[in-house]
């Protein structure tokens, strides 16, 4: 029985890639800098002491990071008994965004350039804004700028509730984000507005990767909270991913947990499981692993590392989340059967010690575990697509156009 379980620790980079300089990210190192901050006693909110990841260390995380940067992450166990195959991968795709990273993991790198709204103020073309106001019958809009999602709620949330004007904002990523109050504006209305925005961006040739619905609740600044009802409207991958091939060629199952289905625009996904928060995502993953049959991929995105800690530059929060993930990892590993493969990886970096609030261009860890997987170094993988090619070969699918089988 062949089953693969892919866990994406969203934004968990392990050192700047060779091309990081052109992204302004030379020297970024999500894992390394978190570990250093913990060792210096600078990440003692909600946790304390050196970064402790014994289970990830046994899978080779520390050694993969050392291969990536030349430095072993401080605090991790150098003498861990390695039980998995480990390496690090560079990104072939042109961006450092979520869709590019995930599509490349599934064997389809993004070799074109996304469109971006690069102006920090008055970010969106007036023609686009006018169409959205008219089609969605809006009283106007707020924002129209680059911002962190939590900051803009404190700035404009109250005005949004009074006026009914949605908050439009973007970032260094190829995104059009819309924040609206779940109760005063309405969740269904927000989703409808996002559908309209997706249509207009596509029809207008803007080449924007995602429209993101950002619903929130609360009644005043400091009390506004984003809810778990986020919804991403992505464009479809430009070629069949290994997910789609498993479904098409083997009649297989691909179970999306978290935001995976949205990232692939629902293509190649046979079942969606919604969960919010690290523990809930872990619980859902374990339940689906228990039920998984032959020719199944269970694919989970642990978004909190990125959204709650990376972008918010919360080092202690990121460290605590990694330690929580590590503590729960044995529950997941206990479910691995003889022919199963477990892959732990990431889609980009988001160094919480780095200036700004954006992603960082980094290598990702590639940790592979299973009874038939030979422990040891996988070395430097030249593309995330090596993961997709490995999974395609494991299931006996037609080869992907990019990547090499690692096993």
Curated annotation (Swiss-Prot):
EC number: 5.4.2.7
Enzyme class: isomerase
Superkingdom to which the source organism belongs: Bacteria
A GO biological process held by the record: 2-deoxyribose 1-phosphate catabolic process
Binding-site list for Mn(2+) 1: 10, 347-348
GO MF annotation list: magnesium ion binding; manganese ion binding; phosphopentomutase activity
Alphabetical keyword list: Cytoplasm, Isomerase, Manganese, Metal-binding
Catalytic activity: 2-deoxy-alpha-D-ribose 1-phosphate = 2-deoxy-D-ribose 5-phosphate; alpha-D-ribose 1-phosphate = D-ribose 5-phosphate
Biochemical pathway: Carbohydrate degradation; 2-deoxy-D-ribose 1-phosphate degradation; D-glyceraldehyde 3-phosphate and acetaldehyde from 2-deoxy-alpha-D-ribose 1-phosphate: step 1/2
Cell location: Cytoplasm
Recorded family membership: Belongs to the phosphopentomutase family.
Stated role: Isomerase that catalyzes the conversion of deoxy-ribose 1-phosphate (dRib-1-P) and ribose 1-phosphate (Rib-1-P) to deoxy-ribose 5-phosphate (dRib-5-P) and ribose 5-phosphate (Rib-5-P), respectively.
Name of this protein: Phosphopentomutase
Provenance organism: Yersinia pestis
